[in-house]
């Protein structure tokens, strides 16, 4: 007597699959990024190939191209994520939490130490620093007027240039020191100098 075989099909919902997929994607992107910056320590940017990254990261070329069109797209994606993190942090900037926001910026830099150390070593790509300057100018002006209600547009521009370039230089020195100093100590010192000085005029 023949018995019918019962086929049992286990269905997984998209919601169940998504976390695993996201973890795989994050792992793959991390491997690509790590390998990319390892190669940047060995050779110039324009000498790195997708093939080298894939061989060293032990991934297929199709996997790389699933996420990035080429090496330039990879770098732009890394920079864009970095800028997005900075933008989100600056968006939180208010008088009551100013020091905490700046400490958060230092943390973002440390979390992206591979990118930041590369920029310190080889210089940022054209327009990168300027884009940060321009992108945050207007909203920073609105927020800083909470500190200094009587400030004029021209005075704000002087202050912004001084503060922006000063913080960039301090962060650069922090990177060169291999992140030894505590960010909260640096922030407390620099902000007290800036704002105690500015308050003499406003």
Regions found by a protein language model. Name each.
Residues 1-43, 47-202:
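Alpha-helical bundle regulatory/interaction domains
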């Amino acid at each position: 007597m023949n018995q019918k075989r019962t086929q049992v099909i286990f269905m997984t919902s998209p919601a169940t699959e998504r976390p695993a997929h996201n973890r795989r994607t994050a792992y793959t992107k991390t491997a690509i990024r790590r390998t990319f910056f390892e190669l940047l320590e060995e050779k110039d940017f324009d000498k790195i190939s997708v093939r080298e990254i894939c061989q060293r990261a032990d991934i297929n070329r199709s996997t790389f191209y699933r996420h990035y069109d080429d090496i330039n797209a990879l770098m732009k994606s890394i920079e864009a994520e970095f800028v997005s993190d900075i933008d989100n942090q600056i968006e939180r900037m208010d008088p009551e939490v100013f020091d905490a926001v700046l400490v958060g910026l230092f943390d973002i830099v440390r979390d992206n130490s591979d990118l930041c150390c590369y920029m310190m070593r080889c210089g940022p790509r054209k327009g990168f620093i300027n884009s940060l300057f321009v992108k945050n100018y207007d909203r920073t002006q609105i927020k800083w007027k909470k500190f200094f209600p009587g400030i004029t547009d021209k005075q704000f521009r002087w202050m912004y240039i001084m503060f922006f370039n000063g913080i960039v230089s301090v962060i650069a020195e922090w990177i060169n020191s291999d992140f030894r100093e505590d960010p909260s100590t640096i922030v407390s010192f620099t902000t007290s100098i800036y704002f105690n000085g500015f308050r003499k005029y406003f």
